Regions:
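Glycine/proline-enriched, intrinsically flexible loops and inter-domain linkers
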Residues: 2-95, 100-123, 127-556
Length: 559
């Protein structure tokens, strides 16, 4: 509903209480959609790790509300309505039509495993909103390739349902390109159920308050969010801030340098990014992925409580040269773009550290180490694919230590519990622990990385593990030390020079050690009782406690 439509309807001004009530109802709808998707899902990646998101768009494709799931998925959803109506004019869309896509350049995605499902919400015979969700399908992509044509099946926005009737040929085409079609089919059904839940709830909301009032409140909510964002930006001292960081992963031979220049002008913020030309590896980031990453970073710094909708975007201005790693063009490969996104957030924090040191955190693990194991389960004779991204340390803050062993920034997924992993797959977790001394020393210590050792049991399987920060460690702030680096080792402890991939035979294992995070402040100022606690809990070694923190004659913890 445009401003003119609102004026003609007599609803140009909606009272703040009504806006709050309807805004909260919209939030409840997308959260309920998200829970429906997770509970109905079949794969461990969605039902256990919650690698999915849900969203409502208005009729024009603006984000009304997104569930508090995966910030990166905002990029996968920005522009998806425009992609749909570009291929399927609005006048041809009917109630019961469902569209599906995944392509990073034409399908509303940022990499191919993220499948978007979108359905129009008809109220009083017209499209009032779009119910949308996205889920990461574990076996939907191949890795380590030079361009997107090699990464997997590309799906532009196509109709999966026409007026409630499934296009079986479209579904068959998708499933034929999957290694575990039953898992994919049931996750797609869960996505369908989530959207249907959202449609039902949105219609009920319109039935209670009236379609025009709900749409007017949505418009007011976007304006309110814009005002909150502007107020938050205005708390950053005006000026120009810059930062650069080195980017290394095991998918490219040489380090790359990313840079950002940030200008704060009153209640608006301008961010310009420089990066090398796009590479022949899946580390490139499409434009919408960059938008989502920046929106997340700015939101968390200026107002974490600000609603996640299109009003947030208005005072944030972003630029990056096309054809570069941070704004790639087809046919650049994009599968591992999360590695790149994490570094973008670190860049923004590094640049703004002098301006708002109390809100900034030191560099996080920045790696999003990804592991994929696939083979034939000897217990069932069926093919399996186990995918997991493994967390690490989060950066220390001005008044608190970083968190240990977590996903950070734009990912926000859960870990797969060992019990669920071993029950679902023919794999054994031999070790799962925090990594001593991996948190950067400081007045406030960086979070610790994780160690996970996985063994193939009763069969041979294919393993693919890759990550970042194997050479450039997560940096500290204001005298804080850097965190530990990433390591990937095949038994018997040999670290490959490039990404670890290949045949893992029965009884062999892969050991994954994720980076820690940077410290904040001079470690000599750290409270002695905290150092002793860390020593007792084996967070730091006696050597580090003595040499870095200056603890006199620390006693090693009991064995």
């Amino acid at each position: 509903m445009s401003a003119g439509d609102l004026a003609r309807s007599g609803l140009a001004a909606v009272d703040p209480i009504t806006v709050e009530v309807i805004g909260s109802a919209l939030s409840s709808i997308v959260e309920e959609m998200g829970e429906t998707l997770v509970r109905a899902a079949y794969s461990t990646n969605v039902k256990e790790r919650r690698d999915s998101s849900t969203c409502l768009f208005d009729a024009g494709g603006r984000t009304l509300c997104q569930a508090m799931h995966i910030p990166m998925h905002l990029g996968s959803l920005i522009g998806v309505v425009e992609h749909v109506v570009a291929r399927h004019p609005v006048e041809t869309i009917r109630e019961g039509d469902v569209f599906i896509g995944n392509d990073a350049y034409t399908g509303g995605g940022t990499h191919l495993p993220d499948i978007v499902m979108i359905e129009p919400v008809f109220v009083d015979g017209a499209i009032a909103a779009w119910a949308t969700n996205i889920a990461h399908h574990a076996d939907f992509v191949d890795r380590g390739h030079a361009h997107i044509y090699q990464e997997g099946l590309r799906i532009p926005p196509v109709r999966l349902y026409r007026e409630g009737q499934i296009h079986q040929d479209v579904l068959d085409l998708i499933l034929l390109n999957c290694q575990v079609p039953t898992e994919r089919l049931n996750d797609l059904r869960a996505q369908m159920a989530a959207n249907r839940q959202g449609i039902q709830r949105f219609r009920s909301l319109c039935g209670k308050y009236g379609r025009d009032l709900v749409l007017a409140a949505g418009e007011a909510l976007l304006d309110y969010t814009e005002r909150l964002t502007r107020v938050g930006i205005a708390t950053i001292p005006p000026g120009v801030y810059a930062f650069e960081d080195r980017f290394d992963t095991d998918e490219i031979a040489d380090e790359k340098v990313f840079a950002v220049r940030i200008e704060v002008r009153g209640d608006e913020i301008f961010l310009h990014f420089d990066s090398p030309p796009q590479v022949r590896a899946g580390l490139n980031l499409v434009w919408t992925g960059l938008l989502a990453t920046v929106y997340y970073a700015v939101k968390t710094l200026v107002g974490p409580e600000i609603p996640a909708n299109a009003g947030l975007f208005r005072p944030i201005h972003i630029s990056a040269p096309a054809g570069t790693m941070l704004n790639c063009v087809a046919p650049a490969a994009v599968n591992s773009r999360t590695q790149t996104c994490q570094r973008v957030v670190d860049l923004i924090h590094g640049a703004l550290a002098p301006a708002i040191p109390d809100r900034i955190i030191a560099a996080c693990n920045g790696a999003c180490v990804s592991s994929t194991f696939s083979g034939v389960d000897p217990r069932t004779g069926r093919f399996y694919v186990y995918l997991e991204t493994i967390g690490g340390g989060s950066g220390a803050r001005a008044t608190k230590d970083g968190l240990d062993g977590v996903h950070v920034h734009i990912t926000n997924t859960s870990n797969l519990p060992v019990e669920a992993l071993e029950a679902e797959y023919p794999l054994v977790v031999e070790r799962y622990a925090l990594v001593e001394d991996s948190g950067g020393a400081g007045t406030w210590r960086g979070g610790l990385g994780l160690l996970r050792q996985i063994r193939a049991e009763g069969h041979d399987c294919h393993a693919f593990v890759h990550g970042a920060r194997r050479r450039s460690a997560p940096w500290g702030l204001f005298g804080g030390h850097e965190g530990g680096k990433c390591r990937i080792e095949y038994s018997p402890g040999v670290e490959p020079p490039v990404r670890a991939q290949g045949l893992l035979r029965h009884g062999e294992s892969v050991t994954i050690i994720t980076p820690g995070a940077g410290g904040y402040g001079d470690p000599r100022w750290r409270d002695r009782s905290l150092v002793r606690r860390d020593l007792a809990e084996r967070v730091v070694s006696p050597e580090v406690a003595r040499a870095i923190y200056g603890l006199d004659s620390p006693e090693p913890p009991p064995s």
